Structures are given as C-alpha cells and as structure tokens.
Amino acid sequence: MIRVAENDAGVTVAGHAGCGPPGQDIVCAAVSVLVQTLALSLNRLSPGETVYSMEPGSATIRYTSLSEKGRLLVCSFFVGIEAVAAAYPNNVTVTRRGSQ
C-alpha cells in the first residue's frame, strides 16, 4: 500500500503498491512520476520554497509557505494522485490536510 499524506509541513509518500514485480508495477510508476514531477516543478518554478528527498519506497517534499504558483502545483499533484487512488483503492491511500 502506498500512503500519501499532506500536512502543514508538506507531502510524504511511503510504501509500495504491490501491483507487479519491481520495475513493472504501473501503480508505483504512476505515483512515482507524479511525486517526482511535483518535487522538480516546485524546485524549478518556485525556487527556494521546498526541500525534498526521494528514496525507493519513500519521498518527502517539505514546504512552509508557497507562492500562488507553488500552491497550484500542489493542487495539480493531488488531482492526479487522487485519480490514481480512486482507480486503485487497494493500493493507494491519500490523506489531505484537514480531512482526518
């Protein structure tokens, strides 16, 4: 199960989808590309606002305040990640800030 969580400090992603062998798991690939795109886009389009780390099975994107552009990028990430979670509810969960 991949768990995506938003909190006041940023976004964390942890776990494995378990939908296929390593390198062939389409759910893991979808989540990975969305997370990497968010981190790289924030870094490039809103420089200085974020710090991120990525390792196999986990990623953390930290931010304390975001510009309007940065907030739009985060919202866009959640549109995509929530679509993946809706399509694969047994493999991906999403918790948004304020939704607990």
Kindly give the residue locations of the regions a language model identified:
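N-terminal intrinsically disordered, cationic/polar leader segments
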Residues: M1-I26, V33-Q100
